[in-house]
Amino acid sequence: MLELKDFATLSRKETPFWYYDMDLLRATVDKAAELARRYGIGLHYAVKANVEPRIVQYISSRGFGADCVSGNEVLFAAANGFRPEIIVFAGVGKSDREINAALDLGIEAFNCESVMEMNVIDSLAAAKGVKANVSVRINPNIDAHTHRYVTTGLYENKFGISRHEFDTVIDLLKNARNLNFIGLHFHIGSQITDVRDVYSLECRRAAEIVDYFESRGLKVDSIDLGGGLGVDYDDPDGNPVPDFETWFSTVDSCLRRRPDQKVSLEPGRSLVAQCGTLVTRVLFVKNGETKAFLIMDAGMNDLIRPALYGAYHKIENLTAAFEGREDGIQQYDVVGPVCESSDVWGSGRDLPFSVRGDLMALRSAGAYGSVMSSRYNLRDIAPAVFSDEL
């Protein structure tokens, strides 16, 4: 969390900026690593969630593998402490250039999402005289009970291979000379809060599909159940570290597996969301015909989640908290400066009486925040500030 003791230092900085609580990051990552060891589960960090080098390097130092979804993420992971043999490469659209780069690195596996992709990897590996480790991403048709834009495991989604192609895939893998099949991969969605019900169903479905592949003569040595554990956007201080215990224990108790099968998960948001805050400042207070607006200097170019998903982020007036003026609650629409009507941080938010220059915090912004920022309207990219460097 952002400590008020740091307010004086932070208030002198030009806004907007990303603030990262490194103590919370370390506590979160260490908790996940400790529980994973206890339950015998491997972890691959979903690199797409946050690519600040300091954050990524700490995660890699704790023994995590890397889950990548582009060639550049693969190269970035390798350059920031992840050994190639624990890097997996997913994504529905891998280019030849990306595949060749990953083959040259000797990554752990390609998580393949189509028959054509497997044929291409087989051909490119043959040209290099190597064998590519591949895992088949399965679309298990499971509703993750989350936002439709981050649901990835239904037949209507573009991800993974559905059951009607299982036999085709199995025959391909038996005959491909340059593919080494190692296992099955699943990922059904993101920001999953119905943890026991959703993941227990995923585990049961995964075991059924493993049985089918093995009945057709393909040994499944690895089961990757993906990521998706949600965080508490409503009360980040009350629940700063996500419930890894429930996630891991559900997998441990519900997934039927052999002692020699490797099981892994891919946390991303759950590791980094709560340690990050987008700090911004009130430029203007505008009293409209029907509502009051707080116009901030951070916009949807910095944090696109509210505009893209209608995502909720808790908003706090840091100056009011520091000065002890938390009475006089008023209702505001908190908006950004970008020339789009969707550039809204929150509508009808109850906040202390706010004035020009107040420092504001958009909480739980460490995941899918800075990585999705842009220079739309030619606005600057916000820098990062780390708690242990103040």
Protein language model regions, located:
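Charged (often Lys/Glu-rich) extended helix/loop segments that serve as interaction or gating elements
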Residues: 4, 250-252, 260-390
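Short acidic, glycine/serine/threonine-rich loops at helix termini
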Residues: 56, 79, 99-104, 121-124, ...
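Structural preference for beta-strand elements that scaffold enzyme active sites
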Residues: 40-44, 63-65, 84-88, 109, ...
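General structural feature for long, well-ordered alpha-helical segments within catalytic domains
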Residues: 21-24, 28-31, 51, 55, ...
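Active-site beta-loop-alpha junctions enriched in small/polar residues
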Residues: 23, 46-52, 69-72, 92, ...
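A charged N-terminal "starter" segment
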Residues: 1-132, 171-180, 211, 215, ...
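Active-site loop/helix belt of alpha/beta enzymes
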Residues: 141-284, 351, 377
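Glycine-centered flexibility sites
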Residues: 63-65, 81, 91, 153, ...
